[in-house]
Amino acid sequence: MADSDDEYDRKRRDKFRGERDSYRPERRDERRPMGGAANSRDEWSERNPFRGSSAAGGGGGGGGARHRPDYSDYRGSGPRARYGSPGREMPPAKRMRPDWGDSEMRSNPRFGYDPYLVQAWNDHYQSLHSAYSHAGHGPSVRETGPAGGGGVSGDTQTQPAMLTLKQFLDTQDENISDSEVMRKYTEYKTDFKRQQLNEFFVAHKDEEWFKNKYHPEDSVRRSEEQRGFLKRRTEVFLELLENGTIGSVKVDSSQADALVRVLDTCVIKLEGGTDEDLKILDEKPKDPPIVYERKSETTESAVVAKREPESPKTEKDDDLPGASSPQHKSLRPVNLDEENWDEDEPMEVHPQTGKDGEKSDDRRSKEPEDEESVKSDNEKKLKKKKIKKRKRNSSDDDSSSSSSSDSDTESDDEKVKAKYDVEEGLRADQKAEALKDKEEAATAAKEKLLAPESPQPEDVVDPKEALEIKSEASEESKQDKTEQPVGQTERPTTDNPAEKNGEEEGAKAEDKPEAGTQESTANEVTETIDLDKVKDGPHPRALHRTSSIFLRNLAPSITKAEIEAICKRFSGYLRVAIADPLVERRWYRRGWITFTRDVNIKEICWSLNNQRLRDCEMGAIVNRDLSRRVRPANGITAHKQIVRADIKLCAKIAMNLDDRFKLWCDSNRSDAEDAEKKAGQEATNGSGASSSPSYGFNSKNPVLQNITDYLIEEASAEEEELLGLAGDNKDGDGEPIERDESLISVLDRLVLYLRIVHSVDYYNHCEYPYEDEMPNRCGIIHARGPAPMRVTSNDVQEYIKAYDGKLQQFLTKTVQLSDEEIKELGAKNPETEVEKFVQANTQELAKDKWLCPLSGKKFKGPEFIRKHIFNKHEEKVEEVRKEVQYFNNYLRDPKRPQLPEHPGSSKRTESESGRGSGYRPPMYPPFSAMPYGFAPPMMGGGGRGGRNFPPVRREMPLEHQRRIIGYHDLDAPINSDMFD
């Protein structure tokens, strides 16, 4: 037992031994020195390679100090990690474990701890920002890390630390005055800010996302594209407003299905769908196709073999091999020719005919008594025939078969031939009856379709009547089919080609004319085929359903055109959307690729995962469908006072966004007038004519017409004053929720306008960016949830105030910076930059000998080079002017992207600023840990005070506890603040 316990302790101490051995090419025991003891592997010094022999306490030759083996020993000679950079050796991603003290690494659960090793990909990109950590500004973020005083994780880029005033004074002369110091320090801060903006622009000016924002050509093109999307959405909204779709739905969570239908209708219209495609919303989702498994077929056939003794024909069928062994069943219903003999479906075999006429008549009489036995007989007969055909084919192909097998095949052929000879007469009679029934059905259909005033029946076909007639004809044909014998369904293909069709074309095949019929009958049946064309015409398309792939990591240098070039090779590709980069992810982006619903999205995702774009793995995964498209908001929003405040907010947001994108400007007056004529009645909601003057909200938007009528608040103030009713009495228990349906209908129209046109979810106080390129063009909406029973006026006022603050981002207008403001930030002059460009391309080789590097030509003077550049290299000069405008557009944006400030640039405490970066960190316990040597508090015990802990329990009152004794000089003046 002692040996077993020792072995157990060894395994418990070294739980990663097997994982390390898997990375080694040779066994670990062979690498151990031979001079050690037998149990030297159990020594603590080997388990902990950072301890020396003195720490181990002796105990074997293997107990000396060892170095930690390199990861190459563990990893072997396999390929490098998937997410690794080519120029950097890294351990496998699965072996990266966070330290317990690194709380900063988990500060951001979304992008914290570099889950996809973006930092490893971005080593080449980091060199662009190497100038950020220049001398005099402290170490870079990656060098300092979380413990270097930066206070941020190594995955976040920041600006270099700006010198404090004290550090700046150390660089100046001692005799400098205070005013001169402040002036120079202000200039230093201005130059520092200009330098950071310029370096950020140079680092990102070649990236597509940056060009779409500020480039003079690309930004205009992108703005026009977005404006086109908004115009199309506006047209769709006005169309839905005109036909009453918008007015028939309320933005309540109880009407989730109606809201989803409105959103899907918008998507279908945006995708170019027609009213015919909208019928797909009324159809129920189809069941998934049945997948036939061969294992179940074997068991079913085995069950049939077990039921053989119950069949009345077992005595004759026992000599055939098909009754005892399970045979192959069909997977789809087709005719029983010899080429697809294994695709027959036993479900179409009807228990009407046997091997001869008498047995068939007897079976008809016994059918009500024993139906299961008849089915089993038919299935066995079908299997027998398959085996006979198989034997017949094999006997024709194989010349070396034995005489016994030949005789069996001949006997089988004789039985089959006799069977068909017996059934021939009965088949002809039933065929005539079936043709007669089909003639009657076609005549009835023709009488219903032909109108008295129309000479052509195709022009007056009503789809509903056609469907009803078709269903009646199909029922009659099914009845005729049940009367047909088994032999008729098993005829060769030369008898009737119409019987080749599958189950989905069964009704069409039944209406086709038979061979040898009269011409009048053929014409009538042809008209029935026209009914099929009416029914099976263009089916509605499910344009609102898509499949999509999510790209987790896209390098900043990857363009949208490159992704489109890869995705266009796959069928069903629709569009691609790329999100704006985030500084937390080192400017890496995310993307969504949209395909049609009928593609194999997993196969496409697998193909994308096997491809690398610009040496970057995109990390493609399948994007799931939206789980809940209608999500509830606070039910207090249905209160009348809150609804009126929401109408005011929605109207302001709509006007601000319309003005930002110039949706209802004078240039589109004709379109706006047409829209007003279409939606004028429903926009006013019966409150008056649309031509009446509106005050406060002057907009051509039909949704905002006469909106001020609903913004005037009414109250019975005089009545309450006379009756002595005070509003404070309601604050105790609150007042019930008061709903005003007229106000709610106006608010719903505004909320849906913001959601459909501007992609603003009002009740979620957020905007869904680039929604027209996303897989779901109208995906999620928040609606009013269940209302509470009562609400106080204090809650109402707080809710209105809080909601107003959350929506300020849509209420504030974006104002570009003026020329004076951007001049302070380092704006450039186009003519000055052009002059610098000319001077840079004018080189003096010798006296009266000048060179133009752009063309390599030599000139006698610089004025000739200047004229040459403006004449022959005009496109280069134009590029310089565009570059200047590009940079100035970046400076004009008040919300321009830039690196966050270094934490050291903010105002620090005196203790932090006095300690240099070269000192070791203080020996304080971690923030979230107890001090060293203290045990955690027990349950029910005391504890320490603080924000996250309960107050300390005191056994005695505060005044009875021991007071702190202080000492002071007796000659000192009396200080009442001193403690005694």
Swiss-Prot record:
Assigned GO CC terms: nuclear body; nucleoplasm
Source species: Drosophila mojavensis
Subcellular location as annotated: Nucleus
Composition bias, Basic and acidic residues: 8-33, 40-49, 305-316, 353-380, 414-450, 461-483, 497-514, 530-539
Compositionally biased tracts (Acidic residues): 336-346
CDD domains: RRM_SF (cd00590)
Functional description taken from the UniProt entry: Acts as a mediator between the cap-binding complex (CBC) and RNA-mediated gene silencing (RNAi). Involved in innate immunity via the short interfering RNAs (siRNAs) processing machinery by restricting the viral RNA production. Also involved microRNA (miRNA)-mediated silencing by contributing to the stability and delivery of primary miRNA transcripts to the primary miRNA processing complex containing drosha and pasha.
PTM sites of type Phosphotyrosine: 83
Gene (UniProt): Ars2
Similarity annotation: Belongs to the ARS2 family.
Subunit structure of this chain's protein: Interacts with cbp20, Dcr-2 and pasha.
Regions of compositional bias (Gly residues) in chain numbering: 55-64
MF (Gene Ontology): nucleic acid binding
Polar residues composition-biased segments: 485-495, 517-526, 682-697
Biased composition (Basic residues): 381-392
InterPro entries for this protein: RBD_domain_sf (IPR035979), SE/Ars2 (IPR039727), SERRATE/Ars2_C (IPR007042), SERRATE/Ars2_N (IPR021933)
Modified residues (Phosphoserine): 85, 311, 454
Keywords: Nucleus, Phosphoprotein, RNA-mediated gene silencing
Pfam families hit by this protein: ARS2, SERRATE_Ars2_N
GO biological process: defense response to Gram-negative bacterium; negative regulation of viral genome replication; primary miRNA processing; regulatory ncRNA-mediated post-transcriptional gene silencing; siRNA processing
Record-given protein name: Serrate RNA effector molecule homolog
Region called Disordered, residue ranges: 1-104, 133-155, 290-540, 675-697, 889-922
